[in-house]
């Protein structure tokens, strides 16, 4: 490779450091930031190219813009700046020569290279090596051959540590954490070895001498341990070979340096064999000596049968107050689930001790509907006759029992499905820092997700998962022995012989993946990789290991990491994460332009992340003793760094409801050992959630976390094992029944326009690359045909349809295309480097009319902008057939007012996806937008505000006919049209509008007539956000499971920045007149959502606009990562021309945004889950049309206010409307709890309201 300054490597030789202007691993975004800080024309730096290995990028600042020039090596290793055609090429031997020439004026660059820009070099604290690269003290164990722990360095005055020369803390610290012995070699003897090699020497005598000197103490320690182990081995095995004796005898003979090293390696190998075999020898000897049968294990575990026994659940029938009056008391049922037989038996006990039972086969159970408000309530829809259903609502003993019942029914459906390939699998993720101690004999609680936090119910713990992934750190067990231990434990637990798919190790960091035997042939494209993140990313005991594979048509990635320790090492942990993200080589090689967070349908990231709590130790212990975890989660470093968008951008994590897993006293889970003796003194290790499991999934995919907790009975380590179980939707290797697509039978992906706002000071041209598994090869667009900038740090680039390619999927079937995703990367024309990547789901883009999309751009783990566009996926009519997925069977009833409120949708069966006809039809109903999403406020940097009490809003029914016909036992009611819903905050589809960006209605549009609703058009209802802690995404009853039961949970970051004026569209079915009326303080009326109950946005200073406030936030603080994209809102002043049938633009969203509330930290760092309700109505023409501009029910807030005034309780109108009780027709279902949530606390007032409603029935 060409050199930087006459040295063999770009960074220069070790003896001659690289010049200040050269930055080896600097990213493009970081380079632009350094140049922006320099601020003077002619400032420059050189970094490695991100697009071409071995090439460089010269970045120059001129007139506040960054200009990038590629420096490419030729076949003779000469360097040259890439030039336009016809310009003569100048070649240089080194980068130093090249920079020297271009430092002169008029050499062809935009300006001369005047001011070299150096990187930021933050000095490490004196105890850096001690805190970062050596973990907690371990119990006395023999050294292991696999250990790579760095021994403590010594001072310069003592090259060899001896017992007579104690080291001092001052002598412990050395540059870069390297020992003084190594440092002295690099300074002096390295040159002598170099000269010897140039002279033809085949060995390195000085390096050998250095290694022998460094390992002399290790020699003696290994000899002692080997001698003791040999004696112990002979006790149990008389035939043991006297290997150690021979080794010690050989050592007494004079040896050269190389012979000493070979002897040490041999000893370590013998030591490894001794340690791995001595337990087996001892067990065999003791068993032979025993006259009775071999003793049973200390904690015997019962072998589980392969079949799942019938499970019974005690429930009560949930009925309305009127029905309860007729019946006399609530009826008790026993629900018996026979998974193997595919039956559900409802057993009702009669008063005369007789029993009445009804049996439903699996195919007659049409849907499960989870209540959002009552966590232990479940609605079950049964098929009584053809196309006629009956719903019963049951109250379980606990929410955990309800979840167990749902899992068993889901398993029953899966087991008896007629599909050849599964739609859904279960995945177990486990992470454990073992503390360099062998595991105990019994780790069943870890395998079965039993312990503290969100654990599985006893009924479901024995159900085997499809995939088990075990990540361990400081695991001293050998790879083969560890794999055998895992397989043996699973065999004993499940009677299944799980097959190992992959095992990857880095030092003592290991990841093992095992799958059910039946899935072995469904696994393909297995890949493994590892990354070191220790000293200089080469030494130490920290890093990551990863495994990836395809399960049929779904890609999975698993990363197990061990990051830098120490309370104060947050920045280094962040860098560890970014290094792993960039360097871990997993997945499809064709996707090398994307980091691993975008290469997989589902990516799981777990391990000992080592993020700590920023709080006084006594406060932490007090909160833990009271089991108050919310205040601790607010100061959790990982949550705070995710909030700043520093790490794990848009990853998800389940709610933490278990105590910190580190640092316990070994042998107990009752005491935290927070004092630790280090060579540099006593160190405080506060209890922390070091061990975590996070995940990131593509938009519009299905994933639910069923458990997340830690064990409380495994005490050998100072960490508790952590477990998480997931229900994951998968796709099959699709085979079209109609064969390959012909020219006349081809699907097309067509783009009308794309616009991106990119964080950059460059003004180059850009193009887009499109990748997808549904394409034969990746495609490129032409360069953008328009660009503009109103801010020096951002650039808006636009492509029209002429610049964008038409993509042709390899298969045209909708069942195949609705599971596909499109990866986009925005690249520059000058350096072909990526400025941002994203993923878009095709599912919501299918249809004959163009749909809008909006999502984030990110690069190397950093948010770099956003991108939006208009596209459609055209599918031939004869290939529109689709089927229901198993995970669409369970939904959430977020408008849970009892069984009368709605009729759930039933299984779609052989429903056809009819999105091709989207033309206006005046006879169809229009369903208004009843609530606007309230965007959360950016929290202060010092901590997170407490979440206010949550209130479950009411959503307006989409179908007026269903309101009057729904009953608790809906016999004789035909099933309504099926509904479909997509909910993924990492990607927004709302007729082109991200839900939280919808503005309040402008006065100019207050009386504007609406376009008529369209056939099969998506009807949307966006209720007010849930700001409290939550476990389950709040979604609508009857929706598809993409939203209802885990369609990719909210990402752990803030909502995207509001787009410029042109970004906001009014959905065609938005009725301005149906917006809730909120009375302001002045007594006037304003249409839009009611203001939040608490934490309003603080008033702005006089003369300050919202835009200037955001810009001020950027300028005032050093950490600009949270607000950098918010600056992009000032860029676009050009209208984004809507296509045919699309609505007009709205005024500036900066003036129309609803007030922000506090961020939701229930699921750490996830903003309040959006609830976009999209129902594809197939038979809307049959419904009674609503009057133009009127409410679907015919009764609005006006009727509510008149009724309240009539009984003298008008004071509660605002509270009731704010909580969704804005319709008299549904007010009859209100309960005392609902009234309290709406602010009715007076018992007499509550009684009056309920009695009046009862009489009105």
Curated annotation (Swiss-Prot):
Changing residue 47 to A: Does not affect the ability to inhibit PKB activity. Residues 1195-1257 form the SAM domain. Residues 156-166, 939-951, 1049-1060, 1088-1104 have a biased composition (Pro residues). GO terms for cellular component: basal plasma membrane; cytoplasm; cytosol; filopodium; Golgi apparatus; lamellipodium; nuclear speck; nucleus. The modification Phosphotyrosine is found at residues 887, 987, 1136, 1161. Keywords: Actin-binding, Cell adhesion, Cell membrane, Cell projection, Cytoplasm, Cytoskeleton, Hydrolase, Immunity, Lipid metabolism, Membrane, Nucleus, Phosphoprotein, SH2 domain, SH3-binding. Belongs to the inositol 1,4,5-trisphosphate 5-phosphatase family. Phosphatidylinositol (PtdIns) phosphatase that specifically hydrolyzes the 5-phosphate of phosphatidylinositol-3,4,5-trisphosphate (PtdIns(3,4,5)P3) to produce PtdIns(3,4)P2, thereby negatively regulating the PI3K (phosphoinositide 3-kinase) pathways. Required for correct mitotic spindle orientation and therefore progression of mitosis. Plays a central role in regulation of PI3K-dependent insulin signaling, although the precise molecular mechanisms and signaling pathways remain unclear. This is Phosphatidylinositol 3,4,5-trisphosphate 5-phosphatase 2. The gene is Inppl1.
């Amino acid at each position: 490779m060409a050199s930087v300054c006459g040295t063999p490597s770009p960074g220069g030789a070790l003896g001659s450091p690289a010049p200040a202007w050269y930055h080896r691993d600097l990213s493009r975004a970081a380079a632009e930031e350094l140049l922006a800080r320099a601020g003077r024309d002619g400032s420059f730096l050189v970094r490695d190219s991100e697009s071409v290995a071995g090439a460089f990028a010269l970045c120059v600042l001129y007139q506040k813009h960054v200009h990038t020039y590629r420096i490419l090596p030729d076949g003779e290793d000469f360097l040259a700046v890439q030039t336009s055609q016809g310009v003569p090429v100048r070649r240089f031997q080194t980068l130093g020569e090249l920079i020297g020439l271009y430092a002169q004026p008029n050499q062809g660059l935009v300006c001369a290279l005047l001011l070299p820009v150096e990187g930021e070099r933050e000095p490490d604290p004196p105890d850096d090596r001690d805190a970062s690269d050596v973990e907690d003290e371990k119990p006395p164990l023999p050294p292991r051959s696999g250990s790579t722990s760095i021994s403590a360095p010594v001072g310069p005055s003592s090259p060899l540590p001896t017992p007579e020369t104690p080291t001092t803390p001052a002598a412990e610290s050395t540059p870069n954490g390297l020992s003084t012995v190594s440092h002295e070699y690099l300074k002096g003897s390295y040159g002598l070895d170099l000269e010897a090699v140039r002279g033809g020497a085949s060995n390195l005598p000085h390096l050998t001498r250095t290694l022998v000197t460094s390992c002399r103490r290790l020699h003696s320690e290994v000899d002692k341990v080997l001698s003791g182990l040999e004696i112990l081995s002979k006790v149990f095995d008389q035939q043991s070979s006297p290997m150690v004796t021979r080794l010690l005898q050989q050592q007494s003979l004079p040896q050269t340096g190389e012979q000493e090293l070979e002897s040490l390696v041999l000893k370590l190998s013998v030591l490894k064999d001794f340690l791995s075999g001595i337990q087996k020898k001892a067990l065999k000897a003791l068993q032979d000596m025993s006259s009775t049968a071999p003793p049973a294990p200390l904690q015997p575990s019962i072998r589980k049968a392969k079949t799942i026994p019938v499970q019974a659940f005690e429930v009560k029938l949930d009925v309305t107050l009127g029905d309860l009056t007729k019946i006399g008391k609530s009826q008790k049922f026993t629900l018996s689930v026979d998974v193997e037989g595919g039956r559900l038996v409802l057993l009702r006990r009669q008063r005369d001790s007789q029993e009445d039972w009804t049996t439903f086969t699996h195919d007659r159970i049409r849907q499960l509907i989870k209540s959002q408000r009552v966590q232990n309530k479940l609605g079950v829809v049964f098929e009584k006759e053809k196309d006629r259903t009956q719903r019963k609502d049951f109250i379980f003993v606990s929410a955990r029992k309800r979840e167990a019942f749902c899992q068993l029914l889901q398993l029953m459906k899966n087991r008896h499905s007629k599909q050849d390939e599964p739609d859904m699998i279960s995945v177990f993720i486990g992470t454990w820092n073992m503390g360099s101690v062998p595991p105990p004999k019994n780790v069943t609680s870890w395998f079965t997700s039993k312990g503290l936090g969100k654990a599985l119910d006893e009924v479901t713990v024995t159900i085997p998962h499809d995939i088990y992934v075990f990540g361990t750190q400081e695991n001293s067990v050998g790879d083969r022995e560890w794999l055998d231990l895992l397989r043996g434990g699973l065999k004993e637990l499940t009677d299944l012989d799980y097959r190992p798919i992959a095992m990857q190790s880095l030092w003592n960091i290991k990841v093992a993946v095992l799958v059910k035997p039946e899935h072995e042939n469904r696994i393909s494209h297995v890949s493994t990789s590892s990354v070191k993140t220790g000293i200089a990313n080469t030494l130490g005991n920290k890093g990551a290991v990863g495994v990836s594979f395809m399960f049929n048509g779904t890609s999975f990635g698993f990363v197990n990491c061990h990051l830098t320790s120490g309370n104060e090492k947050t920045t280094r942990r962040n860098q560890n994460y970014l290094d792993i993200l960039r360097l871990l080589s997993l997945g499809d090689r064709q996707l090398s332009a994307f980091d691993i967070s975008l290469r997989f349908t589902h990516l799981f990231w777990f391990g000992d992340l080592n993020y700590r709590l920023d709080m006084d130790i006594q406060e932490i212990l007090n909160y833990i003793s009271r089991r108050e975890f919310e205040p601790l989660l607010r100061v959790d470093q990982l949550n705070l760094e995710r909030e700043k968008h520093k790490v794990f951008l848009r990853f998800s994590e389940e709610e933490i409801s278990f105590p910190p897993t580190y640092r316990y006293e070994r042998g107990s889970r009752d005491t935290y050992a927070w004092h630790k003796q280090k060579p540099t003194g006593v160190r405080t290790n506060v209890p922390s959630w070091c061990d975590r499991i996070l995940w990131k999934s593509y938009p519009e995919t299905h994933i639910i976390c069923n458990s997340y907790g830690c064990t409380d009975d495994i005490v050998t380590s100072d960490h508790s094992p952590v477990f998480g179980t997931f229900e994951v939707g998968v796709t099959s290797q699709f085979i079209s029944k109609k064969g390959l697509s012909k020219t006349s039978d081809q699907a097309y992906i067509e783009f009308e326009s794309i616009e991106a706002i990119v964080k950059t000071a460059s003004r180059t041209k850009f193009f887009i690359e499109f990748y997808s598994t549904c394409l034969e090869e990746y495609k490129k667009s032409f360069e953008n045909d328009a660009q503009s900038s109103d801010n020096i740090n951002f650039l808006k680039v636009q492509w029209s349809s002429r610049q964008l390619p038409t993509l042709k999927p390899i298969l045209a079937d909708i069942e195949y295309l609705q599971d596909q995703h499109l990866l986009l990367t925005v690249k520059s024309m000058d350096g072909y480097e990526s400025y941002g990547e994203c993923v878009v789901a095709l599912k919501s883009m299918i249809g004959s009319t163009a749909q809008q999309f909006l999502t984030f751009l990110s690069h190397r783990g950093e948010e770099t902008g956003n991108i939006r566009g208009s596209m459609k996926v055209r599918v031939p009519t004869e290939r529109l057939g689709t089927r229901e997925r198993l995970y669409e069977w369970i939904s959430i009833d977020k408008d849970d007012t009892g069984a009368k409120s709605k009729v759930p949708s039933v299984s779609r069966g052989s429903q056809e996806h009819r999105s091709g006809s989207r033309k206006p039809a005046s006879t169809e109903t229009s369903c208004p937008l009843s609530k606007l999403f309230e965007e959360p406020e950016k929290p202060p940097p010092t901590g997170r505000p407490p979440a206010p009490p949550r209130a479950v809003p009411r959503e307006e029914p989409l179908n007026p006919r269903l309101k009057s016909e729904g009953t608790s036992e809906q016999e004789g009611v035909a099933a309504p049209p099926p509904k479909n819903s997509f909910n993924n905050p990492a990607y927004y589809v709302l007729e082109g509008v991200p839900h939280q960006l919808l503005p309040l209605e402008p006065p100019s549009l207050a009386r504007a007539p609406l376009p008529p609703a369209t056939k099969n058009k998506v009807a949307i209802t966006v209720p007010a956000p849930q700001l409290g802690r939550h476990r389950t995404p709040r979604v609508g009853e009857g929706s598809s499971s993409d939203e209802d039961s885990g369609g990719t949970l909210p990402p752990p970051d803030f909502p995207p920045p509001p787009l410029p004026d042109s970004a906001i569209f009014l959905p065609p079915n938005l009725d301005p007149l149906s917006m809730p009326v909120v009375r302001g303080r002045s007594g006037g009326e304003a249409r839009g959502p009611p203001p939040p109950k608490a934490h309003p946005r603080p008033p702005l200073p006089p003369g300050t606009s919202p835009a200037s406030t955001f810009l001020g936030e950027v300028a005032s603080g050093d950490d600009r990562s949270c607000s950098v994209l918010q600056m992009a809102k000032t860029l676009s002043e050009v209208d984004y021309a809507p296509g045919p049938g699309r609505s007009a633009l709205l005024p500036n969203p900066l003036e129309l945004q609803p007030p922000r509330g506090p961020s939701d930290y229930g699921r750490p760092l996830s903003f309040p889950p959006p609830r976009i309700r999209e129902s594809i109505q197939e038979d809307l023409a049959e419904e009674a049309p609503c009057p133009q501009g009127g409410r679907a029910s015919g009764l609005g807030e006006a009727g509510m206010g008149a009724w309240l005034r009539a009984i003298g309780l008008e004071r509660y109108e605002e509270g009731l409307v704010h909580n969704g009780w804005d319709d008299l027709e549904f007010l009859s279902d209100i309960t005392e709890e609902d009234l309290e949530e709406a602010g009715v606390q007076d018992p007499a007032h509550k009684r009056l309201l309920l009695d009046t409603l009862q009489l009105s029935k």
